[in-house]
């Protein structure tokens, strides 16, 4: 009767072709999920510190290594810097621009004439690697808004430099994606790089991606007002955040903001074509909120009345209490900024207010002069709905729940609005609005029925399986093993309406993480520290903790192999060993010369030439064609050392492996005519 015998998973070093090494076992080093002692108390300094780090994990482009604070992230999608300036074909390589448009504006789009357009930079949307325009713009402006409103919190906790790095990375990308002619007129703006349908089937580190990443542009023929206005808003806020510390950079941001808004003013007001790029992933439903969001910031900066005149025809005074501030509904934020503009005088010197805003709006919109209207009253109405269940649902444990997708995202956005309200309406002191926000944040940090923090790495009871390829380091999201890296500061989707939550990597509802989910969370942490911060709230020192390499000394530059062997004996003493291996690494630098060797002894054999090796499965070839592992051998190792030692070799010439792993399965052994003893193999 045929029997099988299993060898447990082993760790072996993986050889680079530049250095041969023996395969030996090495210990597994476990990642800790917390950088300090577990705590269930709400520490808003620590929460603010951690919250910014999520963006280090989602940086994209040729400058990731210079800017990220995570050792496990490196430059990725560097080919975004050389997108072929051509209409995309069936291979999805190129742009959505027509050849005639490219020919007409080649000097603007490709000033160096190399045939490419540079769109590197920015941030991956979520655990995937597409750069979607709406969440990119929203996250950029919302992070900037939080810094603008609660700058002291960042400075007191030592986080100003970090948030400024993130804000520059966002806004530098938005400027790079905006193509101006010699008159500073916007000719084109790239609002998306990558395609969700192409990107989403993969589950690997961004550093090794090689899939097609088409670029999507808006132009005067297809203006897509929501995209261009949302980008203008972020750049306008960026001006306010840097005008006192880097005035030249601030002016550059403002110039781009004005140019983008002028494009939106001049061209037909048009909702984005959701089929051209975002498809079903981010379906924008209106442009008016983004347009007013940008115009409000530009008035606040310039005092130019034309920006208020642009708001009046499209302003929806009644919208804010009907939903929560988010990428597809900016009205809650718009109402806050218009509330600031409606003040008698600005809170900060050099900015502008217009106390007659509501009066002029009523006249413009043919409203009754007797109708009670007040921007801040509208904001307070929204907050009271969040608090009492007038909008959404209050869970049994008191959590404000709005939507299945990203409940924590909406909850923290509502918190941010409540905290901004108290800043301007309660002399910067907490009222019932801030108290409500504080209780909601305490819930998310661990004061909930599950005693679970919905912020990755915050304490020992934090969620541990965010839906994120780079932190996962595994071959598929269904893998339930511990993730390779801790995605510190990421706010996951959150609980459902019954306070339940499932902590699984594959669950992209409960455990989704995105740049828009974290954006208001960062600002809310800063606002809560402004309201409640004291000396008991301290940041984590020496953060993030240094990760230990899992590769064994003498290994291939932080490359190693996890392997599992199953023996399959045949009658008469013959048999084979089925080897399943995964190449793994802590390196963020892709290598294309990976080789793995499996050594075995032929001491029991009469004729080693009968040994055969053959491939059973190559995940790289299946998922990343034309990548293809090649198995060869057997080869004698060194007859002078031991004539009985042989090895088989698997190599992936030309395939990049970094911060990820792919399964490879092969057989080695004898089917007849000799004795196979796997007990002395390694």
Positions of PLM-derived features:
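Bacterial N-terminal signal peptides that target proteins for export
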Residues: 3-17, 28
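Sec-dependent signal peptide cleavage junction
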Residues: 25-39
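Aromatic (Trp/Tyr) and acidic
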Residues: 38-53, 57-142, 146, 192-230, ...
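Aromatic-lined, polymer-binding surfaces characteristic
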Residues: 228, 232-242, 250-254, 260-299, ...
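Low-complexity, acidic Ser/Thr/Pro/Gly-rich terminal tails and inter-domain linkers that flank the onset
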Residues: 541-574
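Short beta-strand elements of extracellular/lumenal beta-sandwich folds
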Residues: 563-592, 598-601
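A surface/secretory-pathway sequence property marking extracellular, secreted
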Residues: 603-653
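Terminal connector regions
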Residues: 657, 663-682
């Amino acid at each position: 009767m045929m029997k099988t015998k299993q060898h447990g998973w082993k760790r072996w070093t993986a050889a680079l072709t530049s250095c041969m090494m023996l395969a030996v076992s090495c210990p597994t080093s476990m990642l800790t999920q917390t950088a300090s002692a577990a705590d269930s108390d709400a520490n808003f300094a620590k929460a603010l510190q951690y919250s910014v780090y999520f963006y280090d994990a989602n940086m994209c482009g040729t400058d990731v290594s210079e800017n990220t604070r995570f050792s496990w992230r490196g430059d990725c999608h560097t080919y975004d810097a050389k997108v072929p300036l051509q209409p995309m074909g069936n291979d999805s390589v190129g742009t959505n621009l027509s050849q005639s448009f490219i020919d007409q504006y080649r000097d603007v789009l490709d000033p160096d004439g190399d045939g490419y357009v540079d769109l590197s930079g920015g941030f991956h949307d979520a655990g995937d690697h597409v750069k979607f325009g709406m969440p990119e713009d929203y996250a950029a402006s919302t992070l900037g808004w939080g810094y603008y409103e609660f700058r002291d919190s960042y400075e007191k906790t030592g986080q100003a430099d970090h948030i400024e790095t993130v804000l520059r990375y966002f806004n530098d990308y938005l400027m790079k994606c905006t193509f101006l002619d010699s008159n500073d007129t916007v000719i084109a703006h790239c609002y998306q790089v990558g395609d969700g349908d192409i990107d989403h089937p993969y589950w690997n580190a961004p550093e090794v991606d090689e899939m097609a990443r088409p670029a999507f542009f808006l132009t005067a023929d297809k203006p897509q007002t929501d995209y261009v206005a949302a980008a203008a808003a972020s750049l306008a806020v960026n001006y306010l955040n840097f005008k006192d510390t880097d005035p030249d950079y601030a002016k550059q941001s403002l110039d781009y903001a004005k140019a983008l808004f002028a494009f939106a003013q001049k061209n037909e007001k048009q909702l984005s074509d959701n089929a051209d790029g975002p498809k079903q992933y981010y379906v924008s439903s209106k442009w008016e909120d983004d347009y007013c969001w940008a115009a409000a910031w530009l008035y606040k900066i310039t005092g130019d009345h034309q920006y208020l005149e642009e708001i009046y025809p499209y302003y929806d005074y009644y919208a804010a209490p009907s939903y929560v501030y988010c990428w597809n509904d900016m009205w809650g934020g718009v109402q806050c900024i218009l509330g600031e503009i409606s003040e008698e005088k600005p809170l900060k010197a050099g900015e502008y207010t217009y106390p007659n805003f509501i009066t002029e709006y009523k006249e413009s919109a043919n409203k009754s002069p007797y109708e009670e209207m007040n921007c801040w009253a509208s904001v307070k109405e929204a907050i009271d709905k969040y608090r009492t269940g007038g909008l959404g649902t209050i869970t049994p444990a008191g959590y404000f729940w709005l939507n299945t997708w990203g409940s924590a995202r909406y909850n923290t956005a509502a918190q941010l609005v409540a905290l901004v309200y108290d800043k301007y309406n309660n002399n910067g002191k907490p009222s019932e609005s801030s108290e409500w926000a504080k209780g909601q944040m305490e819930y998310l940090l661990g004061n909930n029925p599950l005693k679970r923090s919905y912020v990755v790495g915050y304490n020992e009871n934090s969620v541990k399986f965010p839906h994120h390829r780079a932190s996962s380091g595994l071959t598929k999201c269904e893998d339930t093993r511990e993730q390779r890296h801790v995605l510190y500061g990421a706010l996951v989707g959150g609980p459902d309406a019954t306070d339940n939550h499932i902590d699984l990597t594959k669950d992209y509802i409960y455990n989704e993480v995105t740049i828009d989910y974290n954006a208001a969370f960062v600002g809310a942490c800063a606002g809560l520290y402004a309201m409640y911060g004291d000396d008991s709230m301290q940041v984590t020192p020496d953060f993030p903790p240094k990760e230990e390499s899992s590769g064994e000394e003498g290994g291939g530059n932080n490359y190693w192999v996890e392997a599992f062997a199953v023996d399959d004996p045949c009658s008469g003493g013959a048999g084979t060993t089925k080897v399943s291996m995964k190449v793994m690494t802590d390196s963020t630098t892709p290598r294309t010369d990976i080789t793995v060797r499996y050594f075995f002894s032929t001491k029991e054999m009469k004729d080693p030439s009968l040994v055969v090796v053959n491939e059973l499965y190559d995940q790289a070839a299946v998922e990343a064609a034309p990548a293809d592992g090649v198995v060869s051998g057997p080869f004698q190792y060194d007859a002078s050392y031991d004539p009985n030692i042989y090895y088989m070799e698997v190599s992936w010439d030309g395939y990049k492996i970094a911060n990820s792993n792919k399964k490879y399965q092969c057989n080695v052994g004898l089917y007849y005519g000799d004795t196979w003893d796997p007990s002395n193999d390694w």
